[in-house]
Amino acid sequence: MNKLTERVLCVGVSGLILFSVAALVQGTKKCYANPVRNRAASRVKPYADSFKEFTNIDEARAWGDKQFAKYKLSSSEKNALTIYTRNAARINGPLRANQGNTNGLPADIRKEVEQIDKSFTKMQTPENIILFRGDDPGYLGPDFENTILNRDGTINKAVFEQVKLRFKGKDRKEYGYISTSLVNGSAFAGRPIITKFKVLDGSKAGYIEPISTFKGQLEVLLPRSSTYTISDMQIAPNNKQIIITALLKR
């Protein structure tokens, strides 16, 4: 029953995926030949380039819990990660302001950063995987944050074309840590920018849901000072979100 067979798999490549328990909405579909489990009813989608995307909460959580058990984090590392999830801006703000330089940071924040950095020596992805993040218009910077949305909340297409010219095909560096999720869930429904991170096998990334302050986010944390390449930018079918595809550099 679990043997792999070659058949055509249709996957959503530009649409928004939202869930409310079992609800699922997908956008435009495109078909690729891919090995998938015969009749296995798996809701993990292999893409043509072999990146895995979860669309089912329970399957995503089971996968994440399995990874977390492998990390063997110390109590100090767990505590620092929990503190981060409680108020990420408290740590990321100073890191961004200092372009990743920890010199001059308050002693307590510097200590937490050291422990979080240490945890990444134990946390990595066992396979290529898709992670999601939702952002507000401020992600696009002062040139676009106040003009990218029309009054009705839809994307201003003329401004979007300028955004693509500015960002598509370019690298972006984040001096703070990057909080992502295993699923594109309802928590992102109100965010106008959704980034789909392609994360390569062996990349530093940690599933920290079991020790997160706010449960249910299925959070995967990426290291500070990560760089990623924005390979594609599309407007979602509902015309209210920009879907960014980005490859995380190792």
UniProtKB/Swiss-Prot annotation:
Q: Where is the signal peptide?
A: 1-45
What the record says about family reads: To C.botulinum D and C phages exoenzyme C3, and to S.aureus EdiN.
Q: According to its record, what are the GO cellular component terms? A: extracellular region
Pfam families, from UniProt? ADPrib_exo_Tox
Site annotation (Transition state stabilizer) points to E219
Instruction: Relate the protein's function as given in its record.
Output: ADP-ribosylates eukaryotic Rho and Rac proteins on an asparagine residue.
Q: Which residues are named in the active-site annotation?
A: R133, S179, E219
Q: Where does this protein reside within or beyond the cell?
A: Secreted
Q: What is this protein called?
A: Mono-ADP-ribosyltransferase C3
Task: Identify the main location.
Answer: secreted
Gene Ontology MF annotations: NAD+-protein mono-ADP-ribosyltransferase activity; nucleotidyltransferase activity
